[in-house]
Amino acid sequence: MGREGREELGESFAGAVYQKKAVGISATGNHKKPLPLISGTTVSPEGQGDHRIMTYSFRLCLSEDPANRVAFKKPKGYHADRYELFRRFYKSSPKSGIPFDLYPIPGNKLDGNNGIGAQLSTGLVGENWDYPNAGIKRRQEIWDNHRSYTEGLLYFLMTDPAVPEQVRKRMENLGYAKDEFARHGHFPPVLYVREARRMVGDYFLTQKDILETKEKPDPIGIGSFPIDSHDCQRIVTPDGGFINEGTIFPAKTRINGRGIAYQIPYRAITPKVTECTNLLVPVCISASHVAFSSIRVEPAWMVMGESAGIAAAMAIEENTAVQNINQVKFSERLKTKHQVLTLR
């Protein structure tokens, strides 16, 4: 859980990382108390490891079509002061737009996602740190808090006079997609848990595996999403402003702006043989925070999930531990299922 330090595995992106610029607006209120949405007052040393994880958010399915749009409403327990930091940010940057990403998706809809480059967005920075170790009750509280924040933010952006007019007008024309998540009030029922626990197996994927030693003897698929971590904390700076810490902006190829392809090794989804022999882990894989920031996306999980299913079937057929299946036959079976295993 959390982030390895920079020296621990020789990863240049590890630990606390400050790729975003500090914001020179007051982040404190009465008696210099941090405003809501500030997670701390101590600036972590660059490269220091800790328990923190990247922010969670909801992926919103939105629409601008009046015939398929449900307007944002004032949520229960709404307090506009929770978004005072947004007010001050917009006052300092009145030409700023909507603070989250909108991606066109089929059906004339929009996918609303936390903006990795935004200073403030739909991600509730710093309020998910205890999720990995939490029980069901605490996880539900975290889920509820994220929903409350998100619904409140959408309403705030649409109605608060401190929000620039161009943003309020755009928000008035946006709404939840009427034909999505109807049983849940058109709000997505699943929280986007970008990162939680990670396994430590016999092979531990690191930054070097993503960017340098990209070929492996036991590939189960190809990953290519850039190393991409969202904010882990938002801190008051010594001058009273704030800085977001933890974002790793995507490292892309210079040629086509895409991620760098690398082989995903089978060993990264198998536990240590001394600990467990009948488990495959294609999501919370054996990887550092930095490496996981690349492999943590659905295309990679689908590839690893299918390969894990085939491996599980072979372990049963061969009556052996998952670590000991016949790798030659495994590779051939993956190819019959059209898994891409080579970089060329």
Where are these regions (language model features)?
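Flavin (FAD/FMN)-binding glycine-rich loop and adjacent Rossmann-like elements that form
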Residues: 1-344
